[in-house]
Design a protein with these regions (language model features):
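Short gly/ser/thr-rich secondary-structure transition/capping motifs
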Residues: 22-23, 43-49, 117-121
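Thiol/disulfide oxidoreductase modules built on the thioredoxin-like
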Residues: 2-3, 109-114, 121-135
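Short alpha-helix adjacent to the SAM-binding motif of class I
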Residues: 83, 103-110
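N-terminal targeting signals for export/organelle localization
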Residues: 1-43
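Thiol-based oxidoreductase modules, predominantly thioredoxin-like and allied folds used
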Residues: 90-103, 113-124
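A short beta-strand-turn-helix
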Residues: 40-63
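Conserved redox-active cysteine motifs that mediate thiol-disulfide chemistry
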Residues: 66-83
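Short pre-active-site segment immediately N-terminal to redox-active cysteine/selenocysteine motifs
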Residues: 36, 60-62, 66-70, 134
Length: 135
């Protein structure tokens, strides 16, 4: 009898482990499906007196790219974003995530700025609201 409780706990933990190991860690279900986009109001990278807000994106199909000067994969995708920015039917916006403003400005100056506007999110709060877990 004294072994039944630890055995039961072990079996339950083993079942959770078995189910958890079967899940794909790359598949994250979006918490925003069928919900309105969260509101935001952030200064722009290139002009902190100007703001970018959710309302600026309404009424048109927009692509919002989350990027940072320290992000390696952002450097790889940047040439594609530069090409996309030349197409008239794509509204491309950036969300600079957890970065330093001077580094972000320097990165855009060095590599080119494909965005109609890029919001500056130094704390990462807006990115988290949109489900960003990394760049």
């Amino acid at each position: 009898m004294r072994y039944l409780i630890p055995l039961g706990v072990f079996v339950i933990l083993g079942a959770f482990l078995y189910v958890g190991l079967g899940l794909n860690p790359r598949e994250l279900q979006s918490t925003l499906l069928d919900k309105p986009a969260p509101a935001f109001n952030l200064p722009q990278v290139n002009d902190s007196k100007q703001v970018l807000k959710k309302e600026d994106l309404l009424g048109k199909v927009s692509l919002v790219n989350v990027w940072a000067s320290w992000c390696v994969s952002c450097r790889q995708e940047h040439p594609l974003l530069m090409q996309l920015s030349k197409q008239k039917n794509i509204h491309l916006y950036g969300l600079n995530w957890k970065d330093e403003l001077t580094a972000a400005k320097g990165w855009l100056a060095q590599h080119g700025d494909p965005y109609k506007a890029s919001a500056f999110d130094p704390t990462g709060r807006t990115g988290i609201d949109y489900g960003v877990t990394g760049t």
